Amino acid sequence: MIKLSFRPVNGLTAILFIGVLLLIDQWVKIYIKLNYPLTLYGQDAIVDWGFFKLLFVENKGMAMGTRLDTILPFLSEKTAKLLLTSFRLLAIMGLGYWLWDSLRQKNNTVLPYALSLIFAGALGNIVDSVFYGVWFTSSYGQVANWASGSGYAPLFFGHVVDMLQFPLVEWTWPEWLPWIGGERYLFFEYIFNAADSWITIGVMLLLLFNKKIFPPQGEKIQV
């Protein structure tokens, strides 16, 4: 059985780790933004290796393109976007406190890694949502530039840049199946970015080491 071990993390290490992850995420996004126009999902891919595609799409909503005004249709698109960005800011403040507390206690090694990954990913997407509308011109039908005056959207109304897709398996559901019969299905069709990957890895660490990170009351933390 393979046993994973994690080196203890201090505050400086966590900051550097988050900084490197954030730098990677933002470098990729800005490079894509300043060199390519928006692509249409499977069409005009920047890179197309079959199992992997490098694209450029902008996400106005949440994970997998879900939009808050679609879930709550009584909200306008503008209100939904502002609420979503505000929620993200509150969430990252909570994550920051949780990370600080885990570092302060010094009795857990895997939790700071997991929280640092999630924090870096959340922060990366918040930068897009808050600042990209002001920093850049539009990418629709053209390559964006740094905005010398006004950008494509006001502060807090930027779009998250996504570019990675792994369409590994494609099939058509049998006709006899109710509701989905005859429909094409692609796994994994969703387009994401490096920040989403950091969040996913962090959440997976929390799930994999759940019993060690959050042991029953009275038991000693083992990680």
Go through each PLM region and give its residues:
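Alpha-helical transmembrane bundles and membrane-interface segments of multipass inner-membrane proteins
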Residues: 1-223
